[in-house]
Amino acid sequence: MVLIRVLANLLILQLSYAQKSSELIIGGDECNINEHRFLVALYTFRSRRFHCGGTLINQEWVLSAARCDRKNIRIKLGMHSTNVTNEDVQTRVPKEKFFCLSSKTYTKWNKDIMLIRLKRPVNNSTHIAPVSLPSNPPSLGLVCRVMGWGTISATKETHPDVPHCANINILDYSVCRAAYARLPATSRTLCAGILEGGKDTCHGDSGGPLICNGQVQGIVSWGGHPCGQPRKPGLYTKVFDHLDWIKSIIAGNKDATCPP
């Protein structure tokens, strides 16, 4: 009888733990420490709190969202846990920042892209390495990966110590047009998410990567509030459409403009 009571109590504890664990995330889990070597965190010198993500695309350049620009910005590379510092964690400051049309002018749904040149290049290491730019645009239905230190609660600002990752799908742009009023008929953005909801990027993930088949296809831009609602997928700046601009800037053509 005592054994039965003990087993029953253990079962209750296990169920309670499972319920609490499921409530801690917006459809994702802690990223594997080796899967995000290109993921960077943006913060300001004063706040010390990550406000955005970014993507290392070579040893000297980081891709992020225009909405993530701040004064006195800092870029943290090689980070996993905010409580345990990896030996190869590095911090950089921008040497130059570039925006579409040579200015930080973007609408809520367009031209949300920023290219940061680091003041000092970084070297590849155990936890730092760039990711490839896209060779082709992503196909509909493709499963892609999002990641970041953004909030893990849809109702309150609860930021994790480690980056969280989730798989989402590339959706037809018409799905996002149906979800959000005033979206233009065409846009250089990707629509991605889970129609049933429950998996989504959220506050603090902006600027981070949408990774598809080992290439950065999107930049986290914006989405529904609260995060993770059914039929409210996220909008991601389409990197493929900005390839010529990105490559021109990196090659030294500072007057390059984004596609219309």
Curated annotation (Swiss-Prot):
Which residue numbers delimit the Peptidase S1 domain?
25-251
Q: From the UniProt record, list the residues forming the propeptide.
A: 19-24
Keyword field contains Glycoprotein: yes
Which CDD domains does this entry report, sorted A to Z? Tryp_SPc
User: For this chain's UniProt record, which GO biological process terms are given?
Assistant: proteolysis
Q: Which GO terms describe its molecular function?
A: serine-type endopeptidase activity; toxin activity
Please provide, in alphabetical order, the Gene Ontology terms of the cellular component aspect for this entry. extracellular region; secretory granule
Question: What range does the record give for the signal peptide?
Answer: 1-18
From the Swiss-Prot or TrEMBL record, give the protein name.
Answer: Snake venom serine protease homolog KN7
Organism, by scientific name, is: Trimeresurus stejnegeri (Chinese green tree viper)
